[in-house]
Amino acid sequence: MQLTFRLNWPRLSALCISALCIAFLAVGMAVWAGPVRAEPLRPIFVLNSQDGDVSVIDPVTFKQVRRIPTGKEPHHLYLAPDEKTLIVANATSNSLTFIDPVTAEVRRTVPNIVDPYHLRFSPDMRWFVTAANRLNHVDLYRWQGAEAPDPLKLAARIHAPQTPSHLFIDSQSTVVYVSLQDSDEMMAVDLATQKVRWKIKVGKMPADLHLTADDRTLLVALTGDRFVEAYDVSGQQPRLVKRVETDKGAHAFRARGDKRHVFVSNRAANTISLIDTQTLTVVDNYPGPGGPDCMELLADGKTLLVSSRWARKLSFIDLPSKTVVRQIDVGRSPHGVWTLDHAPRR
């Protein structure tokens, strides 16, 4: 018995053409739509120290969409361990403002936190540390959680004259380093014992601190000079390794996210330097208009946000071209700047 199959060529051709059209249409729609983001960009926050509020910037339109009242003199901000709470420190109001970093809604205000100028969480999420700039002490709090009735419990108050400015905690959560701005000193506090390990003289008006990823080299920005001092802190006592010349008024740090390079804002010179922490040399320079202060690096690694303290602006610096590509009007004396869509901080 012989079976005979007869193909309907006109019908088969029509089906093939239809399938090809559908495939090309799908590809075309994908190309037209472009890459799909897992989630939209989150707001950019800028603290306006003299206005007592926070500017919320839309990262798509680059417009200031609202101002959030906080307390008097908000200077610095930090993300809580749950990554759902952005904490703004209101220095002269003795309070903290908890903000949702995605919706920019205020969640709560925590009172009775004395003179919180600068703040840090320990990497193990157990310690919350504040520098009382006006009152000459460093406070060590036990973190209870953002939703706890009393999120912070004071464990120790460390006398820290004169004018504790900035803090940095090592990756093992064992020591907090403190710059003492008006006595030209730096000290280390042991978190286990809540005692001062050491205190040393440094250069003029030390401000921000940055510890390298290996916990070995501590950088100290000297706002009263044009240098960053590098100390080896791996031993019992710190040892000055090098003074790195950047530019006048070296003030704040922001890591590039590669565990090697660090930006430093030179406030008096209106410049920003990039330091190689392995060679301890300046490897690049960028413009920083209007008295550059705090910095944030966007997740693309190409855009540096800078609070222009004297110009009441947030400046956007395109790193590949070394140009200021945008400036947004914010409030008076803009200081801390932050967004959830940032590059790594070490």
What does each model-found stretch correspond to?
Residues C16-G28, W32-R346:
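Predominantly soluble domains enriched in secretory-pathway, periplasmic, or organellar proteins
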Residues M1-A14:
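N-terminal secretory signal peptides that target proteins for export/translocation
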